[in-house]
Amino acid sequence: MGLLANNAEVVGGSIMYRGEDLLKKTEKEMQEIRGKDIAMIFQDPMTSLDPTMKIGRQIAEPLMIHKNVDKKKAWAQALEILKLVGIADAEERINDYPHQFSGGQRQRIVIAIALVCYPEILIADEPTTALDVTIQAQILNLMKELQQKIETSIIFITHDLGVVAGMADRVAVMYAGQIIEYGTVDEIFYNPKHPYTWGLLNSMPTLSSTKLEAIPGTPPDLLDPPKGDPFAARNPYAMKIDAEKQPPFFKVSDTH
């Protein structure tokens, strides 16, 4: 998204979108993509909205910038998407300010802003973390419904495996900033191959067990990453070579 501070540095890899590397785009080129083709929902809805601006204007603004529509048409489309995300009395509430909404309502508004231009990719960064369990379920159901209506792809960033099971088609498990296992949701949950994935699944509470298994040790310091496999020190199945070299990333099936 190109939203990090100027002193942030990408040390390797690429971010491919439509056959082009986003890391090579200028800020002006990214402004044409950001919010239009790729949108993002941030973690905390309480701080994601401008407190001095009516929510209708905040929803309409991306349309005026990216779709080149006039204010009246943008406002009408903002009202339509506000109804779509389930804000009651949208005709009146479109003129309200963020502080007049609850946390769950603010997250719905943030989702409306992200989806108003019908992006191809929606990045959702822990979008339900700051919400209570009941509102979490409502927001997740809303996102699944909107995904089908708008036909957008969602990259869902979360530490909640229950959310993963309910939302995902494919899952990338990350450890120390690296993808260590990738597959369909069924493969990850029912046929995991990496010891870290085993540890995550074993740490989930179940009705059939009274004991939770914890992964031993602590995560590595990413400012001073260890040589070799970053999970080796916590992996009871690690070999000596893992302390020296990264294990290869290999396929066990067409999708895993």
Q: What are the residue ranges of the model-derived segments?
A:
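Conserved ABC ATPase signature
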Residues: 96-101, 105
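ABC ATPase nucleotide-binding domain helical subdomain, centered on the C-loop/LSGGQ "ABC signature"
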Residues: 68, 72-87, 94-95, 190, ...
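Short catalytic/signature loops enriched in Gly
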Residues: 7, 88-91, 182-256
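P-loop NTP-binding/switch modules centered on Walker-like glycine-rich loops
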Residues: 2, 123, 127, 131-213
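Conserved ABC transporter NBD signature motif
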Residues: 10-21
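Short helical segment in ABC ATPase nucleotide-binding domains corresponding to the A-loop/adjacent helical element
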Residues: 16, 46, 52-65, 75, ...
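A short, proline-enriched helix->beta-strand linker immediately N-terminal to the Walker B motif
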Residues: 116-120
